[in-house]
Amino acid sequence: DKKGVFQWYFKRRVDEGGYKISQDYTFDQEAGEVFTQKEETHEVPMGVQDMVSAFYFARTFDFSDIQKGDVFEIPTFVDDELFNLRIKFQGRETIKIRNGKFKAMKFVPLVQEGRIWKDENDLNVWISDDDNKIPLLAKTKILFGSIKMELTEYSGLAHKISKVR
């Protein structure tokens, strides 16, 4: 979108061991509304995101003056409701993943307890400390185990990556 990083459509399909979710949201950013497949209309603020686009949107922020402990919020529409996704900056560090060592910024998205997570601090995300701001690593504890996601390759970046030699 030429006006900004706006969400226009979201589709979610989950089928895990009998647990099923089917969600379709159409966002009308100018009118400030979200339309659901249940034919419900929800009032939302301009620039609202969904659970996936919120993380892409966060990559557009200027983190040059961010301080450890700073929290920023992104209005997010999830599971037929609006909430402010709060993301806490934990600091800068060098991390090692299979692809090498990188200068990174660590963030903790303050997640909703009880659905998947025991504690609101159970998700940790590291993004490259450069103008690309690509996700390098994510770790989370969930009610029935843990998940780890790691960058395995990258190409076509607009800027030099923060890889440590």
Predicted regions and their residues:
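Hydrophobic, well-structured mid-protein blocks that either form specific transmembrane helices
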Residues: Y19-F63
